[in-house]
From Swiss-Prot:
Protein name (record): CRISPR-associated endonuclease Cas1 1
Function field: CRISPR (clustered regularly interspaced short palindromic repeat), is an adaptive immune system that provides protection against mobile genetic elements (viruses, transposable elements and conjugative plasmids). CRISPR clusters contain sequences complementary to antecedent mobile elements and target invading nucleic acids. CRISPR clusters are transcribed and processed into CRISPR RNA (crRNA). Involved in the integration of spacer DNA into the CRISPR cassette. Acts as a dsDNA and ssRNA nuclease, binds to linear and circular dsDNA and linear ssRNA and ssDNA.
GO MF annotations in UniProt: DNA binding; endonuclease activity; metal ion binding; RNA binding
Subunit structure: Forms a heterotetramer with a Cas2 homodimer. Homodimer.
Enzyme class: hydrolase
Alphabetical keyword list: Antiviral defense, DNA-binding, Endonuclease, Hydrolase, Magnesium, Manganese, Metal-binding, Nuclease, RNA-binding
Residues the record lists as binding a divalent metal cation: E168, H239, E254
Amino acid sequence: MRLVVDGFGKYLGIENGLIVVKEKGKALRKVRPEDLKQVLIIGKAAISSDAIKLLLKNRVDVVFLDFNGEILGRLSHPLIGTAKTRREQYLAYGDKRGVHLAKEFIKAKMANQMAILTNLAKARKDSNPEVAESLLKAKKEIDACLNELDGVEAEMIDKVRERLLGIEGKASKHYWDAISLVIPEEYRFNGRRGIEIGSPRYAKDIVNAMLNYGYSILLAECVKAVELAGLDPYAGFLHVDVSGRSSLAIDLMENFRQQVVDRVVLRLISYRQIKPEDCEKRNMVCQLSDNARRLLLASLLERLDSKTQYRGRNLAYSSIILLHARDVVAFLRGERRYEGFVQKW
């Protein structure tokens, strides 16, 4: 279970061994700590030190976010795993394992982009054949990028990172140019902005604000998975090391952007559940209204906890993310080959 504590005046404490959310002294909700897997503290909500201790004792992930979805920090149980895992992670940066992982992360992202475009095209085959044709054309362009990616080989990631990112960037441009065709004009979406930064504070329109908020929530889930698997979240392969940036978690996240975030955002827009007027412009930057932000967050968490068939099992997306973090560990330790997460629907 995930617990969201959102808004000024909300307070999370403990009472008779239970986690309790209060507002103006009145208990709004009580939860057993052992039933929780994550707590999200948003904006100016507060938490007591006793609650923090109880949550950490029960290995509950605690994430602090601002109102824009920016991750301010995390509290988690002391790291698990073995020193061998991290040694292999650092060594892989200088050999072919790092190249293989980077390529698999990008391959999965491109394959999932093509799956999204295929589904969107099928839905418009009769109602808007011209747009459907454009979507399928973009899919073919991404497929060509996949073929180009297959030809990239090197002894270490530093020798091919720029080339890999160039191919990934080209594929993403085809993807977002196509996605813009299915988003109503009133949303004023002209493609991704601030991709490199990936921060909600750089969004100029409501679609980018929604995407960036969603990717922040997904990143928090990936950081948790990477740490639970015993990996160093800051030592990535595809994304370079930057102080304070969880590069490996961002690498892992490439597997899940489309299936966890993009689908949710496109659905909310398609049903007009979040509208252009839910964008509040401040200093030329779009900030989601409180109602839109809460609806988006609830939809994202529901998606993370929803189940799908994967490897013959009915698994939540959050469980699949953890499974893939552990797959990375198994690959680094020479136990089996790593393959990215791809879902055809």
